[in-house]
Structure formats: structure tokens, C-alpha cells
Amino acid sequence: MSISFDLTIDDTRDQLARHARASLEAKPSLIGMSREEMAAALIAAGVPERQVKMRISQLWHWLYVRGVSDFADMRNISKDLRAMLAQHFTIARPEVVEEQISQDGTRKWLFRFPPRGAGRPVEIESVYIPEEGRGTLCISSQVGCTLTCSFCHTGTQKLVRNLTSEEILAQLLTARDRLGDFPDKDTPDGAMVPAEGRKITNIVMMGMGEPLYNFEEVKKALLIASDGDGLSLSKCRITLSTSGVVPEIYRTGDEIGVMLAISLHAVRDELRDILVPINKKYPLAELIKACREYPGLSNAKRITFEYVMLKDINDSLDDAKLLVKLLQGIPAKINLIPFNPWPGTNYQCSDWEQIEKFADYVNAAGYASPIRTPRGRDILAACGQLKSESERLRKSERLALEAMMIAGHGE
């Protein structure tokens, strides 16, 4: 990379700083690599092949058990090797642009990732939901989304790109950093977290994006997250939520083996076509068939069906009856989600009395149908509310500019 020095001193400093950052960002991250990929990368960097298996074991422990983000902290690796690793690779965390804490203890982070050689930095949101005895991290798989589900705030942000396995895992690693969930890390004062054990006990792929439109990177990240020699999360505590990418549902069961959740939200094709437009490609009959055939499906490994409660849209008792009929014979749990409002939406949340009637009918038919307690609404961290802050700012700036132009024309 060439640098022009026909600049002021301040400009030169800025350009040199950008050059240094670009060099740093160009280095591949060891986070998110499979063991096979890490072996190839280490050999290419000059690690003797006879040492590779041992070095991978050391690195895996430091990255995923100890949670270090600086090669200098890897104390059982020689100084020369640490220097070589730092020259060729990075294990740095993303920038935490913002952390918001809800009155109910929910935390939302805005993470910024470097461009990695092209384009501009990207931002995504992750949410931590503490409950008694457990803590759930909601992770994003894409920057934006392609699905345009009409009730979902994320769907109003166009897809920018898929996240890499590194960026998916970095959300978990950084959240564990912030919560003191690695050895020798302190929990923030006043943080609402489980009283004993891990701070993050569960992860759900329910953040920004459709995970199954980024299958390979999501697969790699979740297999690392569930690896017994590292982060060691049980696959029964990892849930992948999809709007219904039918071909990849089969692959999810065969190749990843985590718990499955379906963003259902309607029991008639004509309504689901509007609420969840992917239904036009994979209608309900195909989706439900894939669910019935999901590998490992049992009463101990039920599918969760998510159903947002929209006033006078999908919340009638007739809808409840059709829901029970549609899912007949599938080991399932039905999460009823009170609609979380966001600026500009035309939908309203169902009345609480109607939600309870709906739940009572489904429960009486033999399906657990908990009503999800809204969490983090005051920081737009609740289900369906995620959208990167940078996108909101750009939109607000455009609106402000348009208002100024209108005002100018009116003079």
C-alpha cells in the first residue's frame, strides 16, 4: 500500500494511523477457524508441522477456555512463537460501540467489526437476557436481513453482508468478557446474572438475519461453541431460529444438531405470505413436513414454534385451533410473543386477555405455550426490535436533511 505524504502533519498522522489499522484488519483471525483451518494457517505461517497438533490444543484452550484476546497472555507459549503469531494473526475483539442496560437487566451491545479488506466497517447488535438460573445470549448471523418480515424491525434494514464464523463467535466471547464469564474476570457491579455457574448458559440464533442463509459460517461457529474442549456449550442449550429455509432445516439437524425454532407467526398461507414472505417460496406444508422429519426430534428435543401476537391479525381462537391442528403429532413448544412495538410499525400487540385465551386453548390441547415476557423494550432489545444503530442514525440524518430541504423550499 502506498501513502502520499503531500499532506499537513495532522493529515499525515491520520493517514498513517489508518494505514496501521488497515494492516491490522488485514490479518486473519484465529477465532472461528476449525482445527483443520487453524492447522493449515499455522503451517503456512511457519509453525513446524510436527508441533501443529500441540499448538492447536494450546491455542484452543487460551481462546475458548481462558478467553484471552492478546497473544502476550498465552503464558505457556514461547515469546518468539507469540511474536510470530501476533505478526500473522489477530485474536482481537470487536469494538463495543455502545452498551445499553434495560431496567429489567437486559443488556444490548452494538458491536463494530472491521471491513476485513473491503467495504466499510459493519455494526450488529447482540442481546443478553438474564433470568433466574440462566442467562441467554441472542446472537446475530447477518448484518441486516433479506426477509422483510412485515412485523420485524430488523427486516426494515437491507442485508449488508453475512457475518463470518469469527464475527458470530466474537459476540459470545465479547459478551462473556463484559459479564465476567471467563476465569479471572470480574462481573460488573450490579449486573443481573445467574447467582451460580456460567453467566451465559444458553445461546439463541435469533438476532439480526436469517441464520440458514449463512449456513456454513453459522455451522462452523456453533460447532466451535459446542466443542467440549473449548466453550463447551451443550447443543441442547443452543437454539437456531429460522423463518423456514426448508432445505437447510434438514442440514441443520444432520450437520449441527442443535435445537430448532421456527418463526411461524401464522397458520394460513395467505397471511404468512404477508407476515413472513419466505412462505411464498417454502409454504406451510413444506415447512411442517421438514419439521416432522427433523433429525433427533423427540419429546426431549422438541421444536419451538414462535408466534407473535398481532391484534386482530392472527390472534383469534380460530387461529389457535388451526395452530393445534397444523402441529398435530410434532413434539413442540409454542412460544407466544406479545408484539414489541417499534417506530413506524402499523401493527399492535394483542390485548392481554386475548393472548391468555389463545394460550389456554393451546395448553389444553397438550402443547406448552408460555407467553414470553417482553424484555429490554426500553432499549429496543426485545424480539423483533434489533437494528444496527448506524442504520438508525443514517436514516435519522436523511430525515433531518429532507426536513431542511423542505423548509428551504418553503421560504
From Swiss-Prot:
Q: Which residues form the Radical SAM core domain?
A: 131-380
Chain sites annotated for binding [4Fe-4S] cluster:
C145, C149, C152
Pfam families per the UniProt record, alphabetical = Radical_SAM (PF04055), RlmN_N (PF21016)
What is the required cofactor set for this protein? [4Fe-4S] cluster
What Enzyme Commission number(s) does the record list for this chain? 2.1.1.192
Question: What are the alphabetically sorted keywords of the record?
Answer: 4Fe-4S, Cytoplasm, Disulfide bond, Iron, Iron-sulfur, Metal-binding, Methyltransferase, rRNA processing, S-adenosyl-L-methionine, Transferase, tRNA processing
> What this chain does, per the record?
Specifically methylates position 2 of adenine 2503 in 23S rRNA and position 2 of adenine 37 in tRNAs. m2A2503 modification seems to play a crucial role in the proofreading step occurring at the peptidyl transferase center and thus would serve to optimize ribosomal fidelity.
Cofactor binding mode, per the note? Binds 1 [4Fe-4S] cluster. The cluster is coordinated with 3 cysteines and an exchangeable S-adenosyl-L-methionine.
Q: List the disulfide bonds.
A: C138-C383
Q: Name one GO biological process term.
A: tRNA methylation
Enzyme class label: transferase
Any GO CC annotation of this UniProt entry: cytoplasm
Protein name (record): Dual-specificity RNA methyltransferase RlmN
PANTHER family per the UniProt record, alphabetical: 23S RRNA METHYLTRANSFERASE, RADICAL SAM CORE DOMAIN-CONTAINING PROTEIN
Q: Which organism is it from?
A: Brucella abortus (strain 2308)
What catalytic activity is recorded? adenosine(2503) in 23S rRNA + 2 reduced [2Fe-2S]-[ferredoxin] + 2 S-adenosyl-L-methionine = 2-methyladenosine(2503) in 23S rRNA + 5'-deoxyadenosine + L-methionine + 2 oxidized [2Fe-2S]-[ferredoxin] + S-adenosyl-L-homocysteine; adenosine(37) in tRNA + 2 reduced [2Fe-2S]-[ferredoxin] + 2 S-adenosyl-L-methionine = 2-methyladenosine(37) in tRNA + 5'-deoxyadenosine + L-methionine + 2 oxidized [2Fe-2S]-[ferredoxin] + S-adenosyl-L-homocysteine
Per the similarity annotation, which family is this?
Belongs to the radical SAM superfamily. RlmN family.
Q: What else is known?
A: Reaction proceeds by a ping-pong mechanism involving intermediate methylation of a conserved cysteine residue.
Q: Where in the cell is it found?
A: Cytoplasm
Q: Which gene encodes it?
A: rlmN
